[in-house]
């Protein structure tokens, strides 16, 4: 594999292991990236197995050519939030044995200054997962209202100085538009101070803008609901999160579908009916990376893996 596509997949063995790969199973890698998890799945699949990979990043689609000669593999260019639609088009609803989701931005995207995801590298303020469509971060910052910016920074970045930063951006953009990542990062560093050790003051704002531009949390909601609807009985769901917003969504989703429908006290419903409304069971506890993995790959530090299994009622 070329250096361009080199990428250390986080919690690789644990995530793929959580899928309980069957020789002839059908699996979905909803976030192909550079193919680390897909490669591991293909290595464990038999000749009659099948892997459907999904990604909206054109560079990821290019990277998928490494598996072009493998008849068990196919790549879909699109967002993982629409995975249920893709599965329906393929006539595989209820036949999927496992879904893997590695959420957030990938290392190659962060490391490529031209993608505009990182405040550590100067590049165009883009931040689109699919840079062939949609508005860029620069375009949004140029016309967003102060209240809207503050809401995004607070909601998606949990930024305590959200309103102050939004006001400063609005004041400065009238003089010079924010077109480069360095422009935005320098402004935030100048007007705020991060109280979190070893964390750049712009970290939360960059995260918030990226999540908003790409509708990431909506994509997660849609993907999780879609996964439950396409999984076969005993099919597995493995999801890696990288920050509290993502993990909260995944944790609550698994809990909600593990407990079944909530009914008012005294409502005439049988235990069997409640059981039939349960769609998932959590498999073990949340898995964190080992100290050894964090030492090899610092970006694994904040990762959390949760695994669930589709129930058969």
Curated annotation (Swiss-Prot):
UniProt xrefs under InterPro entries: RsmH, SAM-dep_MeTrfase_MraW_recog, SAM-dependent_MTases_sf
Superkingdom per UniProt: Bacteria
Molecular-function GO terms, alphabetical: rRNA (cytosine-N4-)-methyltransferase activity
Cellular compartments per GO CC: cytoplasm
Keyword Zinc-finger (UniProt): no
E.C. designation(s): 2.1.1.199
Gene3D superfamilies: Putative methyltransferase TM0872, insert domain, Vaccinia Virus protein VP39
Location(s), subcellular: Cytoplasm
Reactions accelerated catalytically: cytidine(1402) in 16S rRNA + S-adenosyl-L-methionine = N(4)-methylcytidine(1402) in 16S rRNA + S-adenosyl-L-homocysteine + H(+)
Keywords for the protein's UniProt record, in alphabetical order: Cytoplasm, Methyltransferase, rRNA processing, S-adenosyl-L-methionine, Transferase
GO biological process: rRNA base methylation
Chain sites annotated for binding S-adenosyl-L-methionine: 35-37, 55, 80, 102, 109
Pfam families registered for this protein in UniProt: Methyltransf_5 (PF01795)
UniProt main location, coarse: cytoplasm
Coiled-coil ranges from the UniProt annotation: none
Annotated family: Belongs to the methyltransferase superfamily. RsmH family.
Function: Specifically methylates the N4 position of cytidine in position 1402 (C1402) of 16S rRNA.
Protein name from the UniProt record: Ribosomal RNA small subunit methyltransferase H
Taxonomic classification: Bacteria, Pseudomonadati, Pseudomonadota, Gammaproteobacteria, Alteromonadales
